[in-house]
Amino acid sequence: MHDAYYNSDNTLVEATTKIGLAAEKLFGAVFNDYAEYRSANADAGRCIIENGDGTLSMSSGRLQLGANIVSDTFGFAIGETDEAKCPIAVSGRVLAYPLEDITMYTPGAAVCSGPEGTISLMTREEIKEWPDAIVGYVSEIPTYDTWGSDNVPVNGRIWIKIK
């Protein structure tokens, strides 16, 4: 790192700082995807619902409120404890399992919870009537099998930008 600044007598001062970092793995170095660890039992890419008492359940239908997606693509995560081991996407993008045929999804389309932990496309009427059921928006339909340096399996999932 190299910095330059002027002293009070207008002489140029330069400072160089060397910073070294050694790590087997550095989380969050480039990602802006955040997750919060919660106590839940669900696979990555599944949509889960807040039950209102601090617990989470797999989504069982469309338009359920309090929906979240379990992440295996986050860069930062907080709150891991002995009980809270399930990373829930808070912001950024996350891979999620779609209910409908993958060819029906287009970038920018709003999605809500679906049965069996899937996400489902919303109609214009549903968006107007239940905006609080929006989980996020389609970001990308992957054409690759793995993602990232950890080779996270895509497994038919699509990218959702969290609301």
Tell me what each language-model feature is.
Residues 1-163:
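Extracellular receptor-binding modules and their adjoining Ser/Thr/Gly/Asp/Asn-rich linkers
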